[in-house]
């Protein structure tokens, strides 16, 4: 029994363990309670000698009569009291309800944290948590911070389910439905950049995605226009002069048919003379009638006419004068080949995508393009030819210039005629 009492007395009333026995200090008053030196709030030599436990420090000073009455108690009862007092309540055990500590509700904890004053503490019985409503129909509610005291209890709050009304989605307009999603995303991104919005993490991926979309759109457009790009070899080379005023402009050009062109147009393009004397005619509403109120594209072009590669000062001035005269007068060039009108227009009248594709291939912004009027309906749109009957009907035959050979002897003859023309001119 003595060994049991001794083991009970050698327990620290702060941590509840025996620990290092040499570091245990006994209370100087009751000689029962013990505490480790490293568990004391203030550890010093004087504290270890005059150590007073918590019970003795709170106990009032006893007079002589009280001490004498204690001595009158039987020894067995005094030993039992001493053993019970040597077992303090550890901190990890639940504090009894008769203690001075009281539980407070989470609402009071929140008010204390915010600095508000609380009136009488109120206690609420935890309510059972109801079944969780479906996702998307409730608003998330911010919970209270968890109390860090050892005796705090978690109070479950019932979340109020708030049913949101269905959001009304407006239908897209027909014009918006025709726009590609990638183009709309790119336009919205460009607007955000224009407003000065800063890029965040992940914008690099979005920028990469927009570039991929633009590249795919351009590739699709290229695939559609590849059959109508200029052929690899030129079919005509010569000079273009104004028949009314030959001295106004005089430039050297070369013509390339489209990769796929009507057979009659291909035959007529080979019959163009070396010296092409054209007549400037106002365009008016001709393009609107020919192309049904839309801008012409590469699929409508039958012959491309590019300036020669000469970069002399005289040739550059003549070339620029031709394009400037057509722009100022809003005119086109007209020439009859075996009774069939050939109309030549400026590159600025094509749609933007066609201009960009030709610029990527030929590295030039200014070029000419021509079409042949092979039908009676197209002849009726041109002033002065409404009663004219087409000499060469369109039989539907299409020439593929990427696979069919060209007549190179014709090109050699064109070179000789040009040399003879230059000699006569000089």
UniProtKB/Swiss-Prot annotation:
Disulfide bonds: none annotated. Keywords: Metal-binding, Transcription, Transcription regulation, Zinc, Zinc-finger. Interacts directly with AIPP3/BDT1. This is PHD finger-containing protein 6. GO terms for biological process: negative regulation of transcription elongation by RNA polymerase II. A zinc finger (PHD-type) spans 9-59. It comes from the Eukaryota. The gene is PHD6. Together with AIPP3/BDT1, cooperates to form a BAH-PHD bivalent histone reader complex able to read histone H3 lysine 27 trimethylation (H3K27me3) histone marks in order to regulate transcription, especially to prevent early flowering; promotes AIPP3/BDT1 binding to H3K27me3. Zn(2+) 2 binds at residues 27, 30, 53, 56. Residues 122-144, 185-205 are annotated as: Disordered. It comes from Arabidopsis thaliana. Disruption phenotype: No obvious developmental defects. Plants missing all PHD finger-containing proteins (e.g. PHD1, PAIPP2/PHD2, AIPP2/PHD3, PHD4, PHD5 and PHD6) exhibit an increased expression of flowering genes leading to an early flowering phenotype under long-day conditions as well as growth retardation. InterPro entries: AIPP2-like_SPOC, PHD1-3/5-6. Zn(2+) 1 binds at residues 12, 15, 36, 39. GO terms for molecular function: histone reader activity; zinc ion binding. The keyword Metal-binding applies.
